[in-house]
Amino acid sequence: NMRREGYEFAVSKAEVLYHTDERGKKLEPIELAYVDVPEEFSGSVIQKLSQRKGELLGMTPINGGYTRLQFSIPSRGLIGYRGEFMTDTKGNGIINTSFEGYEEYKGDISYRKTGSLIAYEDGEAVTYGLFNAQDRGTLFIGPGEKVYAGMIIGENPRTEDIEVNVCKTKHLTNTRSSSADEALRLVPPKILSLEQALDYIDTDELLEVTPTHLRIRKKILDSTLRYRANKK
């Protein structure tokens, strides 16, 4: 019924529920994570989980060239990690978790090491604009797609966000060059599934879910207001 009515959802990154102890200290949920990975991938997994405030409790070799890792880790440290985990272990890793209890807040976590490519203006993405934008990172859209200012249209391999104008058309002149006649080649866009998009979004971003489209956007669409908010 909701699909038929054309409803749209704006979904934020998952958040955990914090508690406060009798001394006013902030507490957060902690989980025990049991991770079975091929030995050659154990170093990468340990590094990633440690960056997410995980504490390695044990490391045991098991059958088939696998290593079993045991971590104590904040629940929020596992948010958005499973997709990354499957990539790092080439689909050969297994991770199981169980709730351990509440402990003192472990500190801030940087969920994503990359930035976003953000649409500069409303309009329709064109080949020329996308061709110039693809040098900045990985695109999530192709030509002909409608975009709006503040919409995320790709991923920047560096940490900062960049505004790009994917609606920009080539300035036409009366003089034609040989290079102008060459077709612009676009790298196929990376199409995110619902699960991948939920893993990707950062705390200042939203995922718009409609019956026909998935769109990622900044919570604050206006670039000036977004800049001011980030300065606070």
What role is predicted for each listed range?
Residues N1-K232:
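Accessory interaction regions appended to the cores of large information-processing enzymes
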